[in-house]
């Protein structure tokens, strides 16, 4: 609430769900989100290898790194490799996308790499799926979320890294209701959690 000068209650409302969700057992639903070993090999080119090595060398504490490259240049694969570093060590990851329309295409690439469904969070996600994702994130049973701005407010149990894809996109700005820039708030959250954020 200090970040965007709104009452604390309004900020908390963005993070909380009905108490019935907290008490429900969704264990069977979480299986589809478990990362599996993909049968497909994903090889990086020289530039991608150099970018990944650079990001890894910066470390796992709070830092802001911008990965430059036009759309389709291979940034996503670098993101995925970096996310896997954290998932293999028991951490969770958040991938922010500027547009809901991008999630389907991104999700297909995600399935190829991680061998599992992704937990997708945006305004079009059903109430039931939101309940499952919220509980899974809170309990540490869902490792990765792909989402729009509002996914920033999910109660991650052990968040290890945040990725902001297309960080320059104007869609990250919200002017209605609580006004904020999701990219800037993602950087703030990474700072608070002392974790890296890649833009």
Task: Report residues per predicted region.
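Accessory, non-ATPase domains that flank or precede helicase/AAA+ motor cores in DNA-metabolism machines
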Residues: 1-199
């Amino acid at each position: 609430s200090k970040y965007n000068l709104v009452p604390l209650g309004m900020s908390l409302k963005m993070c909380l769900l009905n108490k019935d969700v907290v008490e429900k057992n969704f264990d069977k639903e979480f299986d589809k989100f478990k990362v599996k070993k993909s049968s497909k090999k994903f090889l990086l080119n020289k530039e991608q290898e150099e970018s990944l090595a650079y990001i890894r060398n910066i470390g796992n504490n709070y830092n802001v790194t911008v990965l430059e490259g036009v759309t389709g240049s291979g940034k996503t694969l670098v993101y995925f490799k970096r996310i896997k570093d954290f998932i293999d060590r028991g951490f969770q990851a958040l991938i922010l996308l500027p547009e809901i329309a991008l999630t389907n295409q991104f999700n297909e690439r995600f399935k190829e790499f991680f061998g599992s469904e992704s937990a997708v969070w945006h305004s079009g996600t059903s109430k039931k799926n939101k309940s499952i994702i919220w509980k899974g994130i809170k309990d540490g049973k869902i490792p990765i979320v792909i989402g729009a701005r509002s996914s920033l407010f999910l109660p991650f149990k052990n968040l290890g890294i945040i990725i902001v894809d297309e960080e320059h996109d104007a869609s990250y700005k919200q002017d209605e209701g609580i006004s904020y820039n999701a990219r800037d708030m993602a950087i703030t959250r990474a700072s608070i959690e002392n974790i890296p954020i890649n833009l």
